[in-house]
Amino acid sequence: MTRIKRGYIARRRRTKLRLFASSFRGAHSRLTRTMTQQRIRALVSAHRDRGKRKRDFRRLWITRINAVIHETGVFYSYNRFIHNLYKKQLLLNRKILAQIALLNRSCLYTISNEIKE
């Protein structure tokens, strides 16, 4: 019988895994089994946090808008401000409103005066 030599597929797979895990600490970057487990954990965390990042930014924008509104006493609350925006059909999302609140407060005051009941 002729000798069958091992292929390169498993080695290539482990090399790819090693490159992915090269920045991990300790055995997580050296041992194949722990590298595999850590890779799965890293990808799970990345997937989860992509959704979480969207929620976090939305919370930040709402907090910034609310802070400027309360500082000036323009409206009673953020809630009423957004409600009046929708009633007047002004299409400004929270990200844009937060940028306006930070960079150009007088513009936000003008918007609030426009939508007052």
From Swiss-Prot:
Molecular-function annotations in GO: rRNA binding; structural constituent of ribosome
Domain of life: Eukaryota
Single biological process term from Gene Ontology: translation
A matching Pfam family: Ribosomal_L20
A GO CC term attached to the entry: ribosome
Keyword presence, Ubl conjugation: no
Keywords: Chloroplast, Plastid, Ribonucleoprotein, Ribosomal protein, RNA-binding, rRNA-binding
Presence of keyword Endoplasmic reticulum: no
Subcellular location per the Swiss-Prot or TrEMBL entry: Plastid, Chloroplast
Principal subcellular localization: plastid
Signal peptide: none
Cited function: Binds directly to 23S ribosomal RNA and is necessary for the in vitro assembly process of the 50S ribosomal subunit. It is not involved in the protein synthesizing functions of that subunit.
UniProt record similarity statement: Belongs to the bacterial ribosomal protein bL20 family.
Name recorded for this polypeptide: Large ribosomal subunit protein bL20c
Species this chain originates from: Draba nemorosa (Woodland whitlowgrass)
Gene: rpl20
